[in-house]
Amino acid sequence: IFTYAVITGRAEHNPVVDLAGALKSPKQKHFPHLLADQLGGFLRALNDYPGSVVTRNATRLLMLTGTRTIELRAAEWTEIDLEKGIWQIPSIRMKMRRPHVVPLSTQAKALFEEIHQITGRGRFVFPGRNDTGKTMSEASINQVIKRIGYDGKATGHGFRHTMSTILHEQGFNTAWIETQLAHADKNSIRGTYNHAQYLDGRREMLQWYADYMGALEKG
């Protein structure tokens, strides 16, 4: 508006220019995250975690799927199709309010199958310890991270950053990665189309990532 006013002679100066340096963009919050060369040690420590198998597997699944912690914690068994190797998260539970389909690697399927033996009769995949009618607490996964010695070095949300970094470095399709992380697509039609189009590619990508983590864990 001010630029137009200057051009048309309605103003002599654009005050917005003077504010350009004063207005700072909000800083993006960075969560502690693992580097590629730290993954092997972390996974070995996680494997030795003496606590709940369900919580340990939840931590691994967070790493293997790239989902947000809240999306994983509130997972219900009706969303998981182990035969097809697909986890369908309804839009109501997604940050972007769009349904999200997560292809499962063979390792992720095995973890869900192990958990099903423990919690499969209930509604939630990861029920609360004291109340199975509620989901696992928000602090559960970060408590696992703390107990295995990685407090301040890793977080549940940080696993998404680690996955994104490694997959980009390996040259995987950026659209596959962004779709898997359920990042926003400003074009809703394109976003819906891409979601279906990239399913096979994302399955291939997540299988590679699961195999990669397995190799690092073995050392």
PLM region spans:
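Hydrophobic recognition helices of helix-based DNA-binding modules
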Residues: I1-A5, I115, L167, M213
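Non-catalytic DNA-binding core/recognition domains of DNA-processing enzymes
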Residues: I1-Y4, L19, L104
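Catalytic-site neighborhood detector that most strongly recognizes the C-terminal catalytic loop/helix
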Residues: S25-P26, H33, Q88-R97, K109, ...
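Short, polar N-cap/turn motifs at the start of nucleic acid-interacting alpha helices
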Residues: T78-I86, D151-K153, F172-N194, A215-G219
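Hydrophobic, well-ordered secondary-structure elements that form the walls
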Residues: L104, F126, S164-L167, I177, ...
